[in-house]
Amino acid sequence: MDKRTDDAVRETKLKARPELKGDEGWTRLGYANNFDLSYQHIKDTLPRIHCKSISHDEFIARYEKPRIPVILTGCTDSWLANQKWKLSSLAKKYRNQKFKVGEDNDGFSVKMKMKYYIEYLKHQKDDSPLYIFDGSYGEHPKKRKLLDDYHPPSFFQDDLFKYAGEKRRPPYRWIVIGPARSGTGIHIDPLGTSAWNALISGHKRWMMFPTETPKHLLEVSKQDGQHQSGEGIQWFVKVYPKVKSPTWPKEYAPLEIIQHPGETVFVPGGWWHVVLNLDQTVAVTQNFSSPTNFHVVWHKTVRGRPKLSQKWLRALKIYRPEIARIAAEVDLLRQSGLASDSSSDSSSSSSSSSSEESNSESEESTADSIPEQSESKRRKVDAVE
């Protein structure tokens, strides 16, 4: 890297991860040399279906309503992003635009110019590298052009949170760009929302666990993880061997996935997941509330974001009265049935934005009943993969 890029990277790292204390802290574990990124030996356990081979109603009945993860193929075939989101093209078109790669200790975004980030991505040897996880591109006058390059798959277009308004709704869409070893720590997506993640280039390794899996089984302890306990790669180093051991409880058996370019992962609300990039990756991901999962999302939003829920309900009464009637029928005194991560129900996670997310209902009472947070503090945990 040239001096200007090197200076930009050092400044960004100091803001985003001051606890790592310089270059040695970022490479101390030597994962660039000793972590196996090959995936040919991994048994992928998630089925694939072509998006044109199933109707919307069938998708709801087979996957969304029973909350079963699945990989969709063919959904991105017509996207302009397939051509426009090559790293060289992004580096040229958005070279001087700043994208979020983390947060500082006060919860404010740490950003980096695309031209510097792409150079960093190509040359870095960090254990858990900086990761573009930008959720504000849609509101930026120049970066918003990225919205023209893709559209949500048809199964996910009826997003009820849109009625809360773009400025009021929780962060919900992210462009994610990262090198090998970057990723997201173990988490549950915010407010009971489901998510889709479409991969443009590269390969991602996922592990997913059912909602009832106890959080303490999935966490990397601070003692084990040290300064990297919230990072995806550290999870695979410390927890993955336990998951694959004969003593792992069968009732918490995981799903293991290798996501390839052109594949879209559907993550139902409540599923724990951790993601590791195996090479240079570019993806887009969105969280959503649909008529199918609305009863859970409403329950968690009322308890976790009461002011937002009031504004949302007023809009639903006008534009979607049939959904507003469902809201009136939700018993807020009963538990929702989906686990919550203590930091996630005002949000979720990335290696560049600390795990925005125990066991099912015991933790829900704390996560879903947190009061309205200040916007600056919410930003720190409002990112997901």
Curated annotation (Swiss-Prot):
Record field: transmembrane: none
Stretch list, region Disordered: 337-385
Compartmental location: Nucleus
Residues at which Fe cation binds: H187, D189, H273
Signal peptide: none
Xref: InterPro entries: JmjC_dom (IPR003347), JMJD6_ArgDemeth/LysHydrox (IPR050910)
Binding site residues for 2-oxoglutarate: N197, T285
Keywords from the named record: Chromatin regulator, Dioxygenase, Iron, Metal-binding, Nucleus, Oxidoreductase, Transcription, Transcription regulation
Domain JmjC per the UniProt entry, residue ranges: 141-305
Cofactor(s), names only, from the UniProt record: Fe(2+)
One GO process term, biological-process aspect: peptidyl-lysine hydroxylation to 5-hydroxy-L-lysine
Main location: nucleus
Pfam families tied to this protein: JmjC
EC number(s) given by UniProt: 1.14.11.-
The keyword Iron appears for this protein: yes
Motif Nuclear localization signal: chain residues: 377-380
GO molecular function, one term: peptidyl-lysine 5-dioxygenase activity
Top EC class for this record: oxidoreductase
This protein's GO CC annotations: cytoplasm; nucleus
Cofactor note: Binds 1 Fe(2+) ion per subunit.
Residues at which substrate binds: T184, K204
Metal-binding is among the record's keywords: yes
Family statement drawn from the similarity comment of this UniProt entry: Belongs to the JMJD6 family.
Function: Dioxygenase that can both act as a histone arginine demethylase and a lysyl-hydroxylase.
Name of the protein: Bifunctional arginine demethylase and lysyl-hydroxylase PSR
Gene: PSR
